């Protein structure tokens, strides 16, 4: 679990790669993916599920990707909005994407974490 949403739902971060040597993992480039920024983007759940399934497959294509990259995946970035049946907004009726840094730091736990993670993996 990466953090909790404003309503206490888990915001998960999956890390998928191959290699038992931590130093080698830290040298790999990171590919960051997320889904359900806007709750109504239902198709993104199917896409991210397919990507995860593909990466966990034993095909030579997925093995090559995992050998060369670390995948960081947040399958559902706005779990509160999804649970409430919102189309675009979060728990408070606010736009979860593209908020100012001030707003993110003060009020939006999941977005603060998301933007911080993007900053860290640059």
Segments from the language model and where they lie:
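Active-site/substrate-binding loop(s) of hydrolase catalytic cores
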Residues: 2-122
């Amino acid at each position: 679990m990466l953090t909790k949403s404003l309503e206490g739902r888990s915001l998960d971060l999956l890390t998928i790669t191959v290699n038992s040597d931590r130093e080698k993992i830290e040298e790999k480039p990171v590919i960051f993916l997320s889904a359900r920024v806007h709750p109504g983007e239902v198709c993104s759940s199917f896409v991210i599920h397919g990507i995860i399934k593909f990466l966990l497959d034993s095909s030579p294509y997925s093995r090559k990707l995992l050998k060369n990259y670390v995948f960081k995946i947040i399958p559902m970035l706005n779990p509160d909005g999804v649970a409430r049946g919102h189309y675009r907004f979060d728990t408070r009726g606010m736009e979860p994407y593209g908020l100012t840094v001030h707003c993110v730091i003060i009020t939006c736990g999941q977005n603060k974490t998301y933007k911080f993670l993007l900053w860290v993996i640059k």
